[in-house]
Structures are given as structure tokens and as C-alpha cells.
Swiss-Prot record:
Keywords: Acetylation, Leucine-rich repeat, Nucleus, Phosphoprotein, Repeat. It comes from the Eukaryota. This is Protein phosphatase 1 regulatory subunit 7. GO terms for cellular component: chromosome; nucleus. Residues 332-361 form the LRRCT domain. LRR repeats lie at residues 78-99, 100-121, 122-143, 144-165, 166-187, 188-209, 210-231, 232-253, 254-275, 276-297, 298-319. It comes from Mus musculus (Mouse). SUPFAM superfamilies: L domain-like. The lineage of its organism: Eukaryota, Metazoa, Chordata, Craniata, Vertebrata.
Length: 361
């Protein structure tokens, strides 16, 4: 989630440009969720496959692809990892022969309904990312399921998963969900990704005491609230919402990464108990002053670009963070100073990257 570090590479150059790798909006690490190509156990004729075009990049109006009949797909009955990504499958059927399957990937197909999975009692991971599903249903029998991804579909409600009590990771990114609900039984949940939906309030998550990562970016949330029970939370992302104040984080004593960029925050506050923070992203807000963070001595990354910072003396607030390596301060008024980079280096000698450029000493 942090900008990639390249210290020691190309040392003959005075400095080198690197891409800022922004924390996911809210997909988390999609590559990490993909099932490896080595697990592909199905074969399909070339005529039935679509050549290398990502369906997510297509015109959304084009939904006229002909669905493939699953009877044309040869399945390995003994496979534990089945990857049927981009097979143009229109209906889930014929999978009951997979008596040993633990991971089933049905990404980027034409599936409209979750069905005919009740025989897959051994299933641990189910990936339905990028289909045309409008309702979560028919999953009650999959009581051993640990990972469920129904991102990039057409869901309006969170439902039909209250029996999945072994679930550890739930991805419902980029749907049309407007309320967090019906997940109170998921006590084992460690990661919840609800980014790019229509959620207006943080609610109904107080029973998720094992939650470690919560992604709520790109929603319509106006207040940080109802987080007190999540004492194991280490990553919280509420970027690109409608927040005006940093609050409600006092119980998150184990929080290490906090992403609040692209909101309407005016003051840095409310972080008194978050001493373990290593990453703080408050970019693209309305903040005029760095304050109330001198106690965050474990900070490694501080992103405050695109704000209203004017005073160089504010950087003194970061001097206690001896491990601080990366700062983003570009597009603040103080960047107009011709000695901008030099002054940042002098104020924060531990820093190895200023904005998108590495520093070489």
C-alpha cells in the first residue's frame, strides 16, 4: 500500500522517479485474491473463449455475448482448485462432480444467479467477481466457506450470508449496496471490503471483533462512528467519502494504517490513542496545519499532498517519527518555495522519498 521503495537501485543517478502506488479504492490487493494460473483445471475450445479482452474494459452496454453451456467444459473431478475465469459461463451448473474442490473461481463471466452450489460441501473459497449477479442467495449449505468475493456485480443488499459463520474475508466492492447489514453472525471475519458502493453510515459491525481490515472507500459516509468494538483493526480506509472530522477512533489502539484522503477534513485531531500508526493518509482534504500527531513516533509514511499547508515550522510535528521514510506534501502552498525539497530534507532527515521522487544522499 505504500509507495514502493527502491533504495540502492540506480545509485549513479541523483534521484529517480517512482510511481506513487495509491492504496486500493477499495479492492485491496486484487492480484492477491486471484487464484493462481497453476490451478486451472478446465479446458474449453478456442471458439468458446474470448481472446484476451478484459470484460471490465468493455462498453457496459454490450451484454450480448453468447453464454457458454457448461457441458462443453471438461472438469477435473479430483481438482481442489478450479479456475473458470472468463469462460462466458451464463449459468452455474454441472459442478456437483467436483467432490474435492476447495477453491472455485468464476470471475468475469455472464452469471446472473448464484445457484447449484449446495453439493460443494468442501468449498473454502468462492470468487464471483465481475458477473451480473443481483442477489446473494443459495449459499446456506457452504458452511465451510472462508473467502467470498462478489465484487463488481449488481447487488443492492447484503443478505443470504448469515449462515457462513466461518467466513474470514468478504469482498463486495463496486456494487449498489446502500447499507451495512446482515453480517452480525460473521464473528470470524478478518477482512471486509465494501468500497465503491452507496453506503451512508458505518453501522451493524460491532460484533465483528476479529476484524483486522475494513475498506469503505468511495461511499457516502459522513461520520466515523460505531467502531469502538473493533479493537483488532489494523487497517481502516474511509477515503473518498464525505467526512468533515477525524473522530471515533479512540478504541482502535492497534490501528497501523489509516486512509482518509479525499474528504472534507479541516483539522488533524482525534488520533490520541492511535500510537501504532505507521501510515497516515490525509491527502486531498482542507487541512491548513500539521498538528496533534507528535506522539505518532512509529510513522513511516505521511501523505498530506493537496491540502492548504503553508508553514515550514509545522514539519516539527513529525520530528519524533524517527522511522519516517516517505512524505507527500506536493500541491500545498509551501511547495511553491524554490527550496522546497531541500527544506523537507533538512527538517526530516530520515526521509528517503519526497512525493514521487527518491532522495539520494
Amino acid at each position: 500500500m505504500a509507495a514502493e521503495r527502491g533504495a540502492g537501485q540506480q545509485q549513479s543517478q541523483e534521484m529517480m522517479e517512482v510511481d506513487r502506488r495509491v492504496e486500493s479504492e477499495e479492492s485491496g490487493d486484487e492480484e492477491g485474491k486471484k487464484h493462481g494460473g497453476g490451478g486451472i483445471v478446465a479446458n474449453l475450445s478456442e471458439q468458446s473463449l474470448k481472446d484476451g479482452v478484459d470484460r471490465g474494459a468493455e462498453d457496459p452496454e454490450e451484454e450480448h455475448e453468447l453464454a457458454v453451456d457448461m457441458e462443453t467444459i471438461n472438469l477435473d473431478r479430483d481438482a481442489e482448485d478450479v479456475d473458470l475465469t472468463h469462460y462466458r459461463i451464463g449459468k452455474i451448473e454441472g459442478l456437483e462432480v467436483l467432490k474435492k474442490v476447495k477453491s472455485l473461481c468464476l470471475r468475469q463471466n455472464l452469471i446472473k444467479c448464484i445457484e447449484n452450489l449446495e453439493e460443494l460441501q468442501s468449498l473454502r473459497e468462492l470468487d464471483l467477481y465481475d458477473n451480473q449477479i443481483k442477489k446473494i442467495e443459495n449459499l446456506e449449505a457452504l458452511t465451510e466457506l472462508e473467502v467470498l468475493d462478489i465484487s463488481f456485480n449488481m447487488l443492492r443488499n447484503i443478505e443470504g450470508i448469515d449462515k457462513l459463520t466461518q467466513l474470514k474475508k468478504l469482498f463486495l466492492v463496486n456494487n449498489k449496496i446502500n447499507k451495512i447489514e446482515n453480517i452480525s453472525n460473521l464473528h470470524q471475519l478478518q477482512m471486509l471490503e465494501l468500497g465503491s458502493n452507496r453506503i451512508r453510515a458505518i453501522e451493524n459491525i460491532d460484533t465483528l471483533t476479529n476484524l483486522e481490515s475494513l475498506f469503505l472507500g468511495k461511499n457516502k459516509i459522513t461520520k466515523l462512528q460505531n467502531l469502538d468494538a473493533l479493537t483488532n483493526l489494523t487497517v481502516l480506509s474511509v477515503q473518498s467519502n464525505r467526512l468533515a472530522k477525524i473522530e471515533g477512533l479512540q478504541s482502535l489502539v492497534n490501528l497501523r494504517e489509516l486512509y482518509l484522503s479525499n474528504n472534507g477534513i479541516e483539522v488533524i485531531e482525534g488520533l490520541e490513542n492511535n500510537n501504532k500508526l505507521t501510515m497516515l493518509d490525509i491527502a486531498s482534504n482542507r487541512i491548513k496545519k500539521i498538528e496533534n500527531i507528535s506522539h505518532l513516533t512509529e510513522l513511516q509514511e505521511f501523505w498530506m499532498n493537496d491540502n492548504l499547508l503553508e508553514s515550514w515550522s509545522d514539519l516539527d510535528e513529525l520530528k519524533g517519527a524517527r522511522s519516517l521514510e516517505t512524505v507527500y506534501l506536493e500541491r500545498n502552498p509551501l511547495q511553491k518555495d524554490p527550496q522546497y525539497r531541500r527544506k523537507v530534507m533538512l527538517a526530516l532527515p530520515s526521509v528517503r522519498q519526497i512525493d514521487a521522487t527518491y532522495v539520494r544522499f
